[in-house]
Amino acid sequence: MRKGKTWLTGLLIAVAAAASVALAACSSEDENGGVGSLEIRLSALSATAAGLNAQVSETQRYVTGVEAITVTFSRVDVHRSANAGNNDAGWIEVLDSSRPLVERTFDLLLVAGGNFDVLGLTGLPAGHYQQVRVIIDEATVTILGVPSPLAISSGAQTGLKLNRNFTVFDGQETRLTLDFDAEQSVKEESPDSGIYSLDPVIGIVQS
């Protein structure tokens, strides 16, 4: 009877050890499984040179003569955790503020209608990621030749965090597209005030 208990105890220890090794292998594969790359693109929804349905309070007003909606990004980062805060370690830059201003400024009208531009491309450790953070420096809307600054929402200035699960595979490129909804993002303070703000509404599509 004592011998049977000893044998059973040994078996349980062996199984536990095997499970521990397997778990460690899986963890190692996820965290140290090589290097892939991530390309983040920018496209725009509902933005045309003919006009824009800007948000006014709870309604929309069609604004004609829209010639440009330019957005300057400070940086775009990704993180493995969906719960990571702005001050947490582990953010990886895909677009960073060291790049020239002209390379971080995009006209939403030029990336509408199925067009896109590349925000950034970088190598990343292979594995699972769950969050994209977008930080915007400034934005401008040009109507009938007159540029007007867009007041940026505080969230977009400190970091607009978008939850999106995606995987970077060893030796492969992953592409994410940020779909910037111009009509939902551009807001006018009051009808015909000419004072606009930007509260970004952004979706993410993986291709």
PLM segments and residue spans:
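C-terminal motif of bacterial Sec signal peptides marking the signal peptidase cleavage site
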Residues: A22-A25
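A short, solvent-exposed, low-complexity linear motif enriched for acidic/polar residues
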Residues: S27-S207
